[in-house]
Regions:
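Alpha-helical scaffold segments of alpha-solenoid architecture
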Residues: 307, 319-328, 332-355
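Intrinsically disordered, low-complexity terminal tails and inter-domain linkers enriched
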Residues: 262-274
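Short inter-helical turns and helix N-cap capping residues of alpha-solenoid HEAT/ARM repeat scaffolds
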Residues: 12-13, 44-45, 79-80, 111-112, ...
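Short amphipathic alpha-helical surface patches that serve as generic macromolecular interface elements
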Residues: 392, 408, 420-427, 439
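A cross-kingdom feature marking charged/low-complexity
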Residues: 287-295, 351-391, 453
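Amphipathic alpha-helical scaffolding segments comprising HEAT/armadillo-like alpha-solenoid repeats
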Residues: 1-9, 29-41, 62-75, 96-109, ...
């Protein structure tokens, strides 16, 4: 302590002097607060000045705290960015913020990114609950995302309710929801892992993939052990079987819709042309192929909870190469590693067979009954909660081009979908399938939050005779 005290009397860089003062303060049983007062002078570097003010505000008397508060007030309202940054950082070290809280709203709008990021850390350090929504909003902007994430993680379990609310809000972007799941993984407490595993069992698609990756990345395999402790091997096998059954539904759709490009329901159009009818069918087929790839990826992620990560990764790499010799090597690795009940069905996914053959090999998990293309499309829409937004939109585009009827329930539910381009696709379908019903619905959609959708509504109202905004 004496060595540090002697060091603090020398000419030091501001950052070193600030650390020395903080060390002395934390080490001394009865620190001399008056010794810090000279550092409050405006001529002192803001790093040191802010540190001294924060230390005084921790244990000073009323007059000393008032003096330190005034120093920080001047720093927070200073024209120079560095003054405001150091003043803001000092707030995070001070236990007493009453007189300075009124500056927080302005600091949240400060032109300096460094000030705004520093303030997010202050909100977390001081547990200023009234400003927690600002931490969540910070996740939505690239410039403040990392600072907001670190600040939220520092809250530990206190942040969990906020993060769950954000992660489960379907009206938020996938990126923002991913940040919420990521924060839960970085918090890493028993309670946070409970939330992640619970949602793993009920989530689908992108959300399930994100949760799996987050759990796998947790240090010391805490996520892997957390999953095995909570749902066990049988639970993981159930999740793999769910993915296999979903892939079976995709194969059924690809098989039943394979003839759509020459299907006779494209009125007055050459079935061999590259017109919209053929294009929309191909768009849906590509979207379904993408869903198959995503589900396959989730199967590999799930296997990493059961088998050595390097082994599963090697198999995935070889199979993804597409080269026959490497694919065979990948299948051999899986064959020697995997021992789940549905092993043969799983390996079947990676073999060089047609969709029809693969579908036949999944018979122990799902019974395939051929359907007409229109019935298969309606069946897909019954599975809409498992489809990606783009695949769902493609279903409506194909129904519109092919003049296939969909149920009112399917149409109305998807008209309330959180993604704008899905609502666009439903409106375009209704314009062809039921103009009268569309005309009744349009007035309710004029204030759609998506500008493209609201513009589409206005155009349709003018075209169908419903008028525009008044």
């Amino acid at each position: 302590l004496e060595a540090v005290r002697a060091l603090s009397q020398q000419s030091l860089p501001p950052e070193v002097l600030a650390l020395a003062l903080r060390y002395i303060w934390l080490t001394e049983a009865e620190p001399n607060i008056d010794s810090l007062r000279p550092y409050l002078q405006p001529i002192v570097d803001p790093v040191v000045r802010g540190t001294a003010a924060a230390l005084i505000m921790r244990r000073g008397d009323r007059q000393q705290k008032a003096e330190a508060t005034n120093t920080l007030r001047q720093m927070l309202t200073h024209k120079q960015e560095r003054e405001r940054v150091m003043g803001t950082r000092a707030l995070g070290e001070a236990d007493y913020l009453q007189g300075l809280r009124l500056y927080i709203p302005n600091l949240l709008q400060d032109e300096s990114l460094r000030v705004r990021c520093a303030l997010l850390d202050v909100i977390s350090s001081t547990h200023s609950e009234e400003y927690y929504p600002s931490l969540l909003r910070g996740l939505g902007y690239k410039s403040t995302r990392e600072a907001a994430l670190q600040a939220i993680v520092k809250l530990h379990n206190d942040a969990i309710p906020l993060l769950v609310y954000l992660a489960e809000d379907i009206h938020k972007s996938d990126l923002v929801r991913l940040q919420a799941w990521t924060a839960l993984g970085q918090i890493g407490t028993v309670e946070a892992i409970d939330i992640l595993v619970s949602n793993l069992m009920t989530a689908w698609g992108t959300t399930r993939r994100n949760i799996l990756r987050i759990l796998l990345k947790m240090p010391s395999e805490a996520g892997i052990e957390g999953v095995l402790d909570r749902i066990g091997r049988s639970g993981l096998e159930t999740l793999i079987e769910q993915e296999l059954m979903f892939i079976g539904q995709i194969y059924a759709a690809l098989v039943d819709l394979s003839s759509v490009t020459t299907y006779g329901n494209f009125s007055d159009r050459d079935v061999n042309s590259a017109g919209p009818g053929k294009d929309t069918a191909q768009l849906l087929q590509r979207a379904l192929a993408g869903l198959e790839a995503d589900a396959t990826d989730r199967c590999f992620l799930l296997m990493k909870f059961l088998y050595p990560l390097d082994t599963v990764q090697a198999a995935a790499f070889n199979i993804a190469s597409g080269q026959l010799s490497l694919v065979a090597r990948g299948l051999e690795i899986l064959d020697n590693t995997v021992d789940i009940a549905k092993k043969r069905s799983l390996l079947n996914l990676f073999e060089q067979h047609s969709e029809r053959e693969k579908l036949s090999n999944l018979s122990e998990l799902m019974v395939y009954k051929p359907l007409t293309p229109s019935d298969r499309l309606r069946r897909l829409l019954e599975l809409r909660h498992f489809l990606s937004d783009w695949a769902l939109a493609c279903c409506f585009h194909l129904a519109r081009e092919a003049r296939w009827s969909l149920t009112a329930q399917q149409t109305l539910v998807c008209l309330q979908h959180p993604t704008g381009f899905v609502r666009e696709a439903v409106l375009a379908y209704l314009k062809i399938a039921s103009p009268r019903a569309l005309l009744e619905l349009l007035p309710r959609l004029q204030n759609d939050p998506d500008n493209l959708v609201s513009a589409q509504v206005e155009e349709m109202m003018a075209e169908l005779g419903g008028g525009g905004k008044r």
